Amino acid sequence: MGRFILFFIAVIFSGSVMAEWTQLGDDVVKSVGIDTGRGVKTFVNKDGIDKSGQWVVMWTLRNYESPVKLNGKKHFSSKSLEEYDCKDMQYKTLSFYWYSKQQAKGAVVYSETHHGDMQPIIPNPIAHASWKIACGKRLAKQGNNN
């Protein structure tokens, strides 16, 4: 248990210190409970990828063009630690943080740690690109779903 806590703390700090973020694309938020029609830019930290067999851990950052208000809390960016199952094309969020400013800066206005089940990769270009980067797959050309 103690080793898991130390690993988790190390992973949290490694995703924050001098992270090199690579933009995956622009999208529009269309989630239940969140104001829709909001532009969002999604980034991943390729340098912070941690692989162990078919399992990979990678940070994802989202910047919102206007503040997102959810459960009475506003944030301009969110950072999440995702675990990917490269063999079975699944993922789960291990933890996430909401920040008062873009690029995961400013105050942390909310955070949560998850221990949920793996979910299939959503057939969405941004989520699929994240999985491919995390798992070391070559990004397919536009229009090719393989």
Regions found by a protein language model. Give the residues of each.
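Absolute protein N-terminus
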Residues: 1-3, 19
